[in-house]
């Protein structure tokens, strides 16, 4: 589910069939994650201005992903944080990673004590901000919870050349847990050329990509095209549309909605 920035929207999107949500994270000038907020402009047909304070949103997300909580959704297994680091200087990326890790540790993971269980993808728009990953990782180690990195994956969302993305991961010391996004706002059309390159990298013996997702897909025809290209995930404003297509006979044998027992960091071999 795309652009889920208010706590009330978590229920809304999961009830429509989403097993994953994407949330925008904006930063203040000191690189603190401040709001879950997208702002104007955003996808056609959506309200761009829903928001929460980041730490408040994490509290709601924790409840939605903690078994036994009254707000728990068993189906919600993955959260993509779309990190709006464009407002930061390049040299603040490490600090942003540090502060993000501290916020998640406190407000989502409950300091490692029965916190939220969802897998997290840190989605970064700029390859030059790879040190955000370093800062995040080193902070969890320093705070004595390196095991939480098992729950964390990565994405560079700028539609960069696949080879350049590989170099950024090398600099960040990342060797797994890689999701590769490709896409554009639903107001515009985008072909599947780069998606096919990403899928080819995923399926090659020496690729760096574990999963490929495509955004923002709102129509049945474009959903089918993306599935035919071999994507692992689809980001949408209308989870019920994707669920409908997945129930068509052409797709039921090959695709299903992932559950918590599926490993989001493992490349699917069919």
Curated annotation (Swiss-Prot):
What cofactor requirement does the entry state? Mg(2+)
What UniProt keywords apply to this chain's record, in alphabetical order? Cytolysis, Dermonecrotic toxin, Disulfide bond, Hemolysis, Lipid degradation, Lipid metabolism, Lyase, Magnesium, Metal-binding, Secreted, Toxin
UniProt-listed Enzyme Commission number(s): 4.6.1.-
* Tissues in which the protein is found: Expressed by the venom gland.
Active-site residue numbers? 2, 38 (nucleophile)
Residues bound to Mg(2+): 22, 24, 82
Recorded superkingdom:
Eukaryota
**Catalytic activity line of the entry:** an N-(acyl)-sphingosylphosphocholine = an N-(acyl)-sphingosyl-1,3-cyclic phosphate + choline; an N-(acyl)-sphingosylphosphoethanolamine = an N-(acyl)-sphingosyl-1,3-cyclic phosphate + ethanolamine; a 1-acyl-sn-glycero-3-phosphocholine = a 1-acyl-sn-glycero-2,3-cyclic phosphate + choline; a 1-acyl-sn-glycero-3-phosphoethanolamine = a 1-acyl-sn-glycero-2,3-cyclic phosphate + ethanolamine
Top-level class of the enzyme under EC nomenclature: lyase
Cell location: Secreted
Sample GO molecular function, one term: phosphoric diester hydrolase activity
Q: Which cysteines are cross-linked by disulfides?
A: 42-48, 44-187
The note on the cofactor says: Binds 1 Mg(2+) ion per subunit.
User: InterPro entries given for it?
Assistant: PLC-like_Pdiesterase_TIM-brl
Report the principal subcellular site: secreted
GO cellular component entries: extracellular region
Q: Which GO terms describe its biological process?
A: killing of cells of another organism; lipid catabolic process
Say yes or no: keyword Heme present.
no
| Role noted for this protein | Dermonecrotic toxins cleave the phosphodiester linkage between the phosphate and headgroup of certain phospholipids (sphingolipid and lysolipid substrates), forming an alcohol (often choline) and a cyclic phosphate. This toxin acts on sphingomyelin (SM). It may also act on ceramide phosphoethanolamine (CPE), lysophosphatidylcholine (LPC) and lysophosphatidylethanolamine (LPE), but not on lysophosphatidylserine (LPS), and lysophosphatidylglycerol (LPG). It acts by transphosphatidylation, releasing exclusively cyclic phosphate products as second products.
Q: Which family does it belong to?
A: Belongs to the arthropod phospholipase D family. Class II subfamily.
Q: What is this protein's record name?
A: Dermonecrotic toxin LsaSicTox-alphaIB1av
**Source species:** Loxosceles sabina (Tucson recluse spider)
- High-level lineage: Eukaryota, Metazoa, Ecdysozoa, Arthropoda, Chelicerata
């Amino acid at each position: 589910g795309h652009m889920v920035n208010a706590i009330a929207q978590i229920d809304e999107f999961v009830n429509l069939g989403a097993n994953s949500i994407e949330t925008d994270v904006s930063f203040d000038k000191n690189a603190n994650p401040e709001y879950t907020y997208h702002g104007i402009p955003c996808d056609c047909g959506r309200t761009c201005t829903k928001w929460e304070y980041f730490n408040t949103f994490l509290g709601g997300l924790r409840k939605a992903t903690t078994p036994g909580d009254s707000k728990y959704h068993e189906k919600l297994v993955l959260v993509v944080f779309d990190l709006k680091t464009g407002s930061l200087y390049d040299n603040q990326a490490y600090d942003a990673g540090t502060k993000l890790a501290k916020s998640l540790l406190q407000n989502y993971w409950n300091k490692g004590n029965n916190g939220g269980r969802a897998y997290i993808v840190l989605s970064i728009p700029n390859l030059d901000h790879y040190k955000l990953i370093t800062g995040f990782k080193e902070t969890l180690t320093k705070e004595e919870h390196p095991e939480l990195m098992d729950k964390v994956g990565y994405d560079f969302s700028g539609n960069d050349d696949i080879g350049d993305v590989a170099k950024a991961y090398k600099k960040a010391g990342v060797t797994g847990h890689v999701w590769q996004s490709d896409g554009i706002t639903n107001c515009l059309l985008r072909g599947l050329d780069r998606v096919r390159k990403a899928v080819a990298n995923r399926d090659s013996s020496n690729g760096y990509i574990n999963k490929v997702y495509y955004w923002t897909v709102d129509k049945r025809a474009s959903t089918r095209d993306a599935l035919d290209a071999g994507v692992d995930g689809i980001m949408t404003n209308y989870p019920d549309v994707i669920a409908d297509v997945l129930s068509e006979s052409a797709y039921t044998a090959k695709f299903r909605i992932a559950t918590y027992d599926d490993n989001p960091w493992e490349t699917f071999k069919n």
